């Protein structure tokens, strides 16, 4: 039996046949593609970025829909991008990654990274999930962290009614996340003396402290009312903080154990907390069988190292638009999987370009993936300026993965131009 090598096989063929074989197996060379410009426009309240190349291919990324103040920071990175090949995603990211930071300052770097993957996929004629190693699932589960009717009040019956309506939503969500405790300012003002400190204004999620017995009981009563409605048909996760003291966090988590909640999120740190506090989370996790979750505010893989290696939590929830992008998220998810830690990407405000990035990322994540937080277009007219999304987007709690090149979504340019401010009128030029 002959053991043919590829070189030996080709040498044994007639010249014409060998030429034909090579032309079929080796890609035609193309001119090196280069970044020529970086643009940023505020569409609605979302900073949307466009990376422009010398071959007429552009890539798009988006920061969260309330971060319009990030535009100058996005443009700060322009000088570090010009002239580089955008398909060498990691090489380009090495120029800028170290200049990001915890939420909200990682968003600019993350949006740029996502736009680079969009270009890489378009150049290759492949969906982004292929660039990330290929998909292991044809549909991806989402959870509802923000599509909810207005609460009529802050009593347990109001929360029960709210999740009943969410349970009946046409999207068929199999997992719902509700804000409680310090993550829910209205709940904490529902009755007097929920905790011992005074309410703080200013930046978001500024309150923390020691809960009163009344406060603890009210949060638990609202949680129990929601769980009674959802039963085991729809999972219930809670966005809790940041703000709990460790003793209150342990008390609350232990009280939740019989309810088998999907997770308790950000009890100790979270939104706008510029540190992970792995040791404290490890103490919490070891004190309860409830599922402990954190990670949305954390930037970069190095800042997840202690949480993962100390097995300080059960679930990590980085946001692709804050952590450094989808490639960065995938690295973290794979390392977490080695330590039996699940992932559930955060992303309620990531917008419709962000939604596309989530779908491609989730398709390629390892089997520790639970679900990602379903982003929505804000304002509603965003659905009129983007094409390429399935209709309906969510079916029975899942989104089907699409195969169009790049992120697979594009702007309806004329409709989008009508939403640009005069300052950003040249964004699509």
Tell me what each language-model feature is.
Residues 56, 112, 125, 176, ...:
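Conserved, mostly hydrophobic/aromatic
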Residues 1-24:
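N-terminal export signals
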Residues 406-429:
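Extended hydrophobic packing segments that form well-structured cores
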Residues 20-45, 49-51, 58:
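C-terminal segment of N-terminal export signals and the immediately downstream linker at the start
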Residues 57-126:
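Metal- or metallocofactor-binding catalytic centers and their adjacent structured scaffolds
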């Amino acid at each position: 039996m002959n053991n043919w090598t590829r070189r030996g096989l080709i040498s044994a063929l007639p010249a014409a046949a060998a030429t034909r074989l090579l032309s079929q197996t080796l890609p035609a060379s193309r001119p090196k593609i280069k970044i020529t410009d970086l643009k940023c426009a505020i569409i609605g309240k979302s900073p949307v970025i466009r990376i422009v190349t010398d071959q007429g291919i552009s890539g798009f990324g988006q920061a969260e829909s309330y971060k319009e103040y990030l535009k100058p920071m996005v443009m700060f990175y322009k000088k570090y991008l010009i002239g580089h090949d955008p398909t060498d995603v990691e090489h380009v990211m090495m120029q800028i990654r170290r200049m990001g930071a915890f939420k909200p300052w990682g968003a600019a770097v993350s949006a740029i990274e996502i736009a680079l993957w969009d270009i890489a996929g378009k150049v290759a004629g492949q969906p982004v999930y292929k660039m990330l190693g290929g998909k292991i699932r044809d549909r991806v589960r989402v959870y509802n962290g923000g599509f909810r009717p207005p609460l009529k009040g802050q009593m347990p019956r109001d929360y029960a009614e709210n999740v009943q309506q969410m349970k009946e939503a046409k999207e068929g969500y199999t997992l719902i996340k509700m804000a409680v405790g310090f993550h829910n300012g209205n709940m904490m003002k529902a009755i007097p003396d929920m905790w011992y400190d005074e309410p703080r204004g200013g930046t978001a999620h500024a309150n923390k402290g020691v809960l009163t017995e009344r406060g603890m009981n009210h949060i638990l009563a609202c949680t129990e009312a929601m769980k009674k409605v959802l039963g085991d048909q729809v999972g219930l996760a809670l966005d809790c903080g940041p703000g709990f003291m460790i003793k209150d966090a342990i008390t609350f988590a232990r009280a939740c154990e019989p309810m088998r909640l999907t997770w308790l999120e950000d009890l100790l740190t979270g939104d706008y907390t510029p540190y992970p506090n792995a040791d404290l989370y490890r103490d919490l996790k070891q004190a309860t069988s409830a599922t402990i979750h954190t990670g949305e505010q954390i930037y970069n893989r190095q800042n997840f190292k202690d949480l993962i290696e100390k097995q300080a939590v059960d679930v990590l929830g980085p946001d692709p638009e804050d952590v450094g992008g989808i490639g960065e998220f995938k690295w973290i998810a794979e390392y977490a999987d080695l330590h039996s830690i699940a992932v559930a990407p955060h992303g309620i405000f990531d917008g419709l370009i962000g939604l596309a990035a989530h779908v491609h990322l989730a398709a390629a994540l390892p089997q520790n993936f639970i679900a990602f937080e379903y982003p929505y277009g804000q304002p509603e007219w965003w659905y009129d300026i983007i094409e390429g999304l399935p209709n309906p987007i969510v079916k029975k709690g899942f989104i089907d993965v699409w195969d169009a090149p790049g992120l697979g979504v594009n702007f309806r340019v004329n409709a989008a131009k009508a939403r640009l401010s005069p300052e950003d009128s040249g964004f699509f030029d």
